[in-house]
């Protein structure tokens, strides 16, 4: 018999010499090819969905800051751009991202920024697909991460958070694989040094690590009881955990602002909790998903998909519970990031990444439990038999999903995807048309114009800063880590008086400038 027509045999543990015929090598090669095509379809769709016109405002003050850092070889420690808070401390943990963004912009303008953003989001999804659900068919993993990709691309703006999403995916993948390869834990301190100097959400890495430590401790204590899986023999010992944990703490301090930088996430958490009522009605991304859904209904595909993904992840815990199995690590992760996601729209993306991981890992564990149960009985495990009918059904499923993903990717090129998602955007690698007030900012920056400006939109203030800062300053911009709540109130009151034609706005401005130390 020719070699290519031979069938392979696999021995089932506990069955002695019993052999089971499985799919021949030729069919397996076809299966691998279709699985690769499926992953390529997902990553292609993710990249194309990510390439939408740039419409975030914060990128302009990020770019200006990066340019100034490269020109002056110095980092900001006090405010560079406003006259109302000119003496305020500025803990700018974004400086790493800002340098990268400024260099990218210098090399290829907005087009290259959008392409790099798409590449980073696609990398995040790729890490998720390859790192989670080791026991799952490729079709299921791609299906789950397709949902995640829709959520991520719905908020695919050029900001430091796109780096945080990728770092979060790497961190989660490292923690998942560290039980069998504890040497991977040594990668975390260097990653933390990079993360803490790019975005304040480096704290996500600490949250994930804390959840993992609690899980390891409880599984060690349970020794296979209480529905907790036994620890693998290769799991890191206490000495390694203490050393890595200490290095992570030190890594958080390796930033230009030392302990202020390490503790800066607490400032953000205050806005998330104590000051939530104030900021949620003034800043769109601080709005809760429930409030946003109440405003627009079912018109946002990305929000609907985020809700479906969360419900599936939550249901997977219930399904796992029917097998008397609990994962403390995944449970704590899900609760922590669900809390963040329910609080603010801006947190939907990291919550989606965690939900995707939880869903894949929970289903993967269910598959493994079923295999163990079947292997302990007289029947050959269903997953190992793979009858031809099931195999070809799976092939058809993979081909169908690939075609759908390629079709949805193509729909973004025609504009249909934008109408479906409610965003209305078409594939583009430039700025959103008539979105930024570049010409007005340049006009107001001409010689003879005032060196201080009041920009009625603190988003557009970033555009003014990009063209005219830091020699010309604005009353307030979108850097809520610099501009205080009191400044925000003065800003709103001044704009209201100006709109009403009340000259009393000048008195308010004078009072604000006096409080800010500006003469």
Language model features with spans:
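Transmembrane-helix signature of polytopic, membrane-embedded enzymes
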Residues: 40, 128-151
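Membrane-interface alpha helices of multi-pass inner-membrane proteins
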Residues: 46, 148-153, 174, 185-200, ...
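Transmembrane catalytic cores of multi-pass membrane glycosyltransferases
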Residues: 58, 70, 200-324, 358
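Transmembrane-helix motifs of polytopic, lipid-linked glycan transferases
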Residues: 115-135
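Membrane-interface transmembrane helices that cradle and orient dolichyl/undecaprenyl
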Residues: 171-185, 315-322
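Membrane-proximal, lumen/periplasm-facing interface regions of secretory-pathway glyco-
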Residues: 380-447, 459-461, 480, 496, ...
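Short periplasmic/luminal acceptor-recognition loop of GT-C membrane glycosyltransferases, typified by
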Residues: 445-486, 519
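Luminal/periplasmic acceptor-recognition loop/helix of membrane-associated glycosyltransferases
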Residues: 471-519
């Amino acid at each position: 018999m020719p070699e290519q027509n031979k069938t392979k045999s696999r021995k089932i543990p506990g069955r002695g010499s019993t052999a089971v015929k499985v799919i021949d090598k030729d069919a397996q090669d076809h299966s691998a090819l279709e699985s690769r095509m499926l992953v390529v379809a997902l990553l292609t769709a993710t990249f194309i969905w990510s390439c939408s016109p740039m419409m975030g405002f914060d990128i302009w003050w990020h770019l200006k800051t990066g340019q100034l850092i490269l020109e002056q070889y110095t980092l900001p420690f006090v405010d560079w751009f406003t006259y109302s808070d000119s003496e305020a401390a500025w803990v700018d943990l974004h400086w790493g991202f800002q340098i990268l963004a400024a260099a990218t912009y210098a090399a290829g303008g907005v087009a290259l920024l959008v392409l790099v953003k798409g590449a980073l989001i696609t990398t995040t999804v790729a890490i998720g697909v390859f790192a989670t659900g080791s026991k799952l068919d490729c079709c299921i993993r791609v299906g789950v991460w397709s949902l995640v990709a829709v959520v991520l691309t719905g908020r695919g703006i050029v900001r430091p958070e796109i780096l945080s999403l990728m770092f979060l995916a790497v961190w989660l993948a490292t923690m998942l694989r560290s039980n069998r390869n504890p040497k991977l834990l040594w990668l975390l301190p260097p990653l933390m040094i990079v993360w803490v100097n790019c975005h304040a959400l480096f704290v996500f890495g600490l949250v994930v690590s804390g959840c993992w430590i609690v899980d390891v401790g409880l599984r060690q204590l349970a020794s296979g009881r209480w529905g907790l899986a036994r620890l693998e023999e290769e799991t890191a010992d206490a000495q390694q955990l203490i050393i890595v944990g200490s290095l992570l703490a030190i890594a958080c301090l390796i930033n230009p602002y030392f302990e202020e930088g390490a503790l800066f996430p607490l400032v953000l958490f205050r806005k998330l909790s104590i000051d939530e009522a104030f900021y949620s009605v003034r800043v769109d991304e601080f709005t809760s998903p429930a409030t946003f859904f109440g405003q627009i209904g079912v018109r946002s595909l990305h929000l609907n998909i985020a809700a479906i993904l969360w419900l599936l992840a939550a249901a997977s815990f219930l399904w796992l519970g029917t097998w008397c199995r609990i994962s403390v690590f995944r449970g704590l992760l899900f609760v922590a990031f669900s809390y963040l996601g329910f609080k603010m729209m801006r947190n939907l993306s990291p919550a989606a990444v965690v939900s995707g991981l939880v869903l894949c890992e929970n289903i993967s564990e269910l598959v493994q439990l079923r295999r163990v149960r079947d292997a302990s009985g007289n029947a050959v495990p269903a997953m190992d038999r793979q009858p031809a009918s099931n195999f070809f059904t799976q092939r058809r499923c993979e081909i169908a999903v690939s075609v759908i993903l390629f079709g949805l990717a193509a729909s973004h090129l025609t504009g249909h995807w934008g109408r479906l998602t409610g965003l209305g955007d078409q594939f583009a690698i430039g700025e959103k048309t008539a979105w930024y007030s570049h010409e007005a900012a340049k006009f107001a920056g001409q010689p003879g114009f005032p060196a201080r400006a009041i920009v009625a939109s603190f988003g557009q203030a970033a555009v003014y800063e990009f063209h005219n800062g830091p020699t010309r300053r604005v009353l307030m911009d979108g850097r809520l880590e610099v501009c205080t709540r009191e400044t925000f109130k003065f800003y709103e009151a001044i704009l209201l008086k100006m709109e009403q034609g009340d000259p009393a706005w000048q008195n308010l401005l004078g009072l604000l400038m006096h409080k800010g130390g500006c003469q």
